[in-house]
């Protein structure tokens, strides 16, 4: 489980000091819940996120243990270093918007016909309660030829999960290489 500290002060000087000491600044918030200003060791946070298996993961801040989802993050424009992360509390029974990642399986037929697999979207925004939330959407791309796409409407949504995006938006496709 990922462990962090509660930030007592939210001043600019205190934030800079924490970043210098190797901490990642985080805000944890949720519907009807009090915001928690936290900080995590940057290396531990990145390592944990790369190896996590589920979209929703537990964190311990001070003596509080909450289930969260990464909602938004900020990177340094030059170095690409992670500066700040917003974590949304995943409360059972409360529907919220989440960005669910896309994973593809198989090799498209179109790659043999001088095509290239293109991701139009890496994540799909859905509204669901955390208990119904899929960890990812797996798309089978083996039958895609040059010019074919998988659209939002082609994705099977689990029960209790709603997608409000335009159904004709492409997610992945194969285009002709130039």
Swiss-Prot record:
Pfam families given in the database record: Ribosomal_L25p, Ribosomal_TL5_C
Keywords for this protein: Ribonucleoprotein, Ribosomal protein, RNA-binding, rRNA-binding
Coiled-coil annotated spans: none
GO MF annotations in UniProt: 5S rRNA binding; structural constituent of ribosome
Top-level taxonomic group: Bacteria
UniProt family annotation: Belongs to the bacterial ribosomal protein bL25 family. CTC subfamily.
Biological role stated in the UniProt entry: This is one of the proteins that binds to the 5S RNA in the ribosome where it forms part of the central protuberance.
Subunit organization: Part of the 50S ribosomal subunit; part of the 5S rRNA/L5/L18/L25 subcomplex. Contacts the 5S rRNA. Binds to the 5S rRNA independently of L5 and L18.
Name assigned to this protein: Large ribosomal subunit protein bL25
Phylogenetic lineage: Bacteria, Pseudomonadati, Campylobacterota, Epsilonproteobacteria, Nautiliales
